[in-house]
Regions:
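Short beta-strand element of the alpha/beta-hydrolase
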Residues: 67-73, 77-88
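Cap/lid segment of the alpha/beta-hydrolase catalytic domain
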Residues: 93-145, 202-203, 209
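Hydrolase active-site cap/lid region
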Residues: 178-224
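Acidic catalytic loop of the alpha/beta-hydrolase fold
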Residues: 255-260, 288
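Histidine-bearing beta->alpha loop at or near hydrolase active sites
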Residues: 279-290, 297, 301
Length: 308
């Protein structure tokens, strides 16, 4: 069915010489911020099988970020853990079903998402272009760090086996998965679907679909900022994080995806350094990336890497 040749496309993304220095400094800043994590039992959502907690923790620029933390009541400790990162227009999940399968689970809500949007809310559309031409204050800086601090939270929980943490998400959640896998070696397995924020300078030429069209809208209004936008994005593009990913990882895409073009996944896979990596490319599928079938592949992947 596919008439494109996404595996032949390549990328225009360039990794800045000071990329590792830039992120090293940000990680140090983040490390120096105490988590100050608090857990509040959610009695309404707690069941006989799963305890549900609303978690609050501190992140960059003193923002208090929120997430859902689910624990199976009857499974032996310490538990393997799975983190679920949200998409761009979707809200955080409450992953009780996976907790019932024997995992400690965390539904992340980085700044701007539900329950973390009173502190920071550029709206939709808006996050993608918020301070787009300034790498030091670009919106995704805090967003990425909020996401990786979930890993820090989990490693501090006595009921979690810090050697068995997996992370996952699709679209923007796939991007956050890639960044967290790159910046947190505690991650032992990762699954990224239809990864967003990957090959961004390529994607804005390949699609006219939102959210990427937000950037094209911005550049139509401010064409003089294109070079500055590209320079900023090179510090945030997932392709430039990929060579730091060492854990087992699966990536899945739809070959007819007009939201996150499949062409951007191939240079990403080329850069990932993990000795155990696999790309699933589904013909006949768009941004859904065949997740209704692939979800079982993901569950099996995590069971194999985190439960054995």
């Amino acid at each position: 069915m596919n008439q494109r040749a996404p595996s032949k496309y390549g990328t225009q993304v360039i990794k800045p010489d000071d990329f590792d220095i830039f992120w090293g400094e940000l990680l140090e800043r983040s490390h120096n911020i105490p988590l100050n994590a608090s857990l509040t039992l959610d009695s309404m959502r707690t069941t006989e099988q799963v305890e549900v907690f609303e978690v609050h923790y501190d992140s960059l620029n003193s923002l208090r970020v929120v997430g859902w933390y689910c624990l199976p009541r009857l499974k032996p400790r310490p538990l393997p853990a799975r983190v679920f990162y949200p998409g761009y227009i979707s809200e955080p999940t409450l992953p009780k079903a996976h907790a019932e399968q024997g995992y400690a689970t965390f539904g992340a809500a980085p700044r701007g998402k539900l329950r973390s949007n009173l502190q920071f809310n550029p709206g939709y559309p808006g996050l993608l272009t918020h301070n787009l031409v300034d790498r030091q204050s670009y919106a995704y800086q805090g967003f990425y760090l909020d996401a990786i601090r979930v890993i820090d939270f989990l490693t501090e929980q006595p009921e979690v086996d810090s050697e068995r943490i997996g992370i996952q998400g699709s679209s923007q959640g796939g991007a956050l998965t890639l960044v967290a896998a790159a910046l947190r070696p505690q991650v032992k397995a990762a699954s990224a679907g239809a990864p967003y924020l990957t090959g961004v300078v390529d994607a804005i030429d390949l699609t006219r679909t939102y959210p990427y069209e937000e950037i094209n809208d911005y550049l139509r209004l401010h064409p003089q900022y294109r070079d500055a936008m590209v320079k900023t994005w090179n510090y945030y593009d997932c392709i430039n994080f990929a060579d730091r990913i060492q854990c087992p990882i699966i990536v899945y895409i739809g070959l007819q995806d007009d939201v996150c073009p499949p062409e951007t996944a191939y240079p990403l896979m080329d850069k990932i350094q993990s000795p155990e990596k696999k790309l699933y490319a589904y013909d006949g599928h768009g941004h859904d990336a065949n997740h209704h079938v692939h979800d079982q592949v993901v569950d099996t992947f995590f069971d194999n890497h985190l439960k054995t």
